[in-house]
Amino acid sequence: LLSSAASDVYKRQGADPVSRVVQKREAPDPATFVGKGKASEIQEESDQADADTVVFDDELSPAQQFNLEKILKRSALDRTAVILDIFAQNATTLEGKAQVELAQLKYRLPRLRGRGNQLSQQGGGIGTRGPGETQLEVDRRRIQRRLAKLEKDLTGLRRTRKNQRKSRRRSRFHTVAIVGYTNAGKSTLLNRLTGAGVMVEDRLFATLDATTRRLQLPGGETVLMTDTVGFIQKLPTDLVEAFKSTLEEVG
């Protein structure tokens, strides 16, 4: 269920969209998002196109995703999963990687039903399981422990960034934030104005971390210019936290 714009997003990620289905309905079906009949139609279309995965250009609840995969007999991804995958490919700093992993684990945790063995293989060693504990419970407990550690690590990293902002404010320089949609040319603008050397690529979310450089204006005044992670339409609410560094810099 992809718009043409969404198809471009997935092509940039190396996917090969082979078919597209569009549906208009007043409200999503609570069980399958598209309704059982439409889901069966998509399953037939996927078989004919020999598709490995069906991507929905919207958010699916854990139950909807689970039900769809049973009907479609193949992986069903939603918009959040794709954006998280893009984030994971582009995260380079310690904070960026931690924030992406945190968002991924929060996304996976309620989707553990029926996927315990698969997730345990993705995560490596699990450790000692308690008596009578199922694989699903072990995976859930492992993810919860990792979430707690990531939250603690990010608290420390954000404290450091907060101190850096205070230091910049004490310098009495005005701060200018470059804000816009992803892949709109924000990093290119920063490089052109300041010679910053920030990585520039023709792909979504190439920048995930705020970068600040000095810029001397023609009148002689020096300002601090900050490049930020780009926004995207229909950003899933659970991913707003991943933009925290940008929102704090702009604020």
Predicted features by range, described:
Residues 15, 49-51, 221:
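Short, high-confidence coil segments that cap the C-terminus of an alpha-helix
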Residues 11-32:
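Short beta-strand elements in bilobed, periplasmic/extracellular small-molecule ligand-binding domains
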Residues 60-70, 221, 244-251:
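Conserved C-terminal guanine-recognition region of P-loop GTPase G domains, centered on the G4
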Residues 29-44, 229-251:
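Switch II of P-loop NTPase G domains
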Residues 12, 48, 67, 104, ...:
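Residues on one face of amphipathic alpha-helical coiled coils
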Residues 40-111:
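Accessory, often N-terminal, substrate/partner-engagement and coupling regions
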